[in-house]
Amino acid sequence: MEKKFYELPELPYPYDALEPYISEEQLRIHHEKHHQAYVDGANGVLRKLDDARENGEEVDIKAALKELSFHVGGYVLHLFFWGNMGPADECGGEPDGRLAEYIEKDFGSFQRFKKEFSQAAVSAEGSGWAVLTYCQRTDRLFIMQVEKHNVNVIPHFRILMVLDVWEHAYYIDYRNVRPDYVEAFWNIVNWKEVEKRFDDLF
């Protein structure tokens, strides 16, 4: 059976589609260079593990799995990231339907949710992500911070929306002013996609 490897996906929109909030230059470098680096990194670890297993060689499993988690986490989180954004004339605003009802239930209001998610993004230490998740055991929405990319599958939690707050995600457009980038993000949130991710869980 042939073994498969990761490939860089195409974006669901042109590189200039998120302007003026994310420039074409910023998005192109983020996708073609940084996301590609996680693809290459993950595939490199997989090949190293494959070779060691085929040849009966020893491998530092702890180091290999940490490196694999980092690169696969980066690969997967970026898939969510590209998908939960879109052109400002089609996106932004507030969610509808079941997701809106759960935000009201769990946070009190959309404005309260937006404030807490923004605070999570701005306050993430160093490089990381703000993530909206859903816990099936408690039937609740959760906001989480992810350090770097080292996130593995957490049972009963499903990722709904992510915001990349690594500096490579915004430095060309916003320099070191992360709060401005976070505020701009709300203009390009693709709520239809986030709603679909949530509805698909029921």
From Swiss-Prot:
Keyword RNA-binding: no
EC supergroup of this enzyme: oxidoreductase
Coiled coil: none
UniProt KW keywords: Iron, Metal-binding, Oxidoreductase
Positions bound to Fe cation: 30, 78, 164, 168
Swiss-Prot/TrEMBL cofactor(s): Fe cation
Domain of life: Archaea
Molecular function GO terms recorded: metal ion binding; superoxide dismutase activity
Reaction equations catalysed: 2 superoxide + 2 H(+) = H2O2 + O2
Cofactor details (free text): Binds 1 Fe cation per subunit.
Signal peptide start-end: none
PROSITE patterns recorded: SOD_MN
Keyword Repressor among record annotations: no
Enzyme Commission number(s) from the entry: 1.15.1.1
Quaternary context: Homotetramer.
Function text: Destroys superoxide anion radicals which are normally produced within the cells and which are toxic to biological systems.
Protein family per UniProt: Belongs to the iron/manganese superoxide dismutase family.
Name the record gives this protein: Superoxide dismutase [Fe]
UniProt organism field: Methanothermobacter marburgensis (strain ATCC BAA-927 / DSM 2133 / JCM 14651 / NBRC 100331 / OCM 82 / Marburg) (Methanobacterium thermoautotrophicum)
Gene that specifies this protein: sod
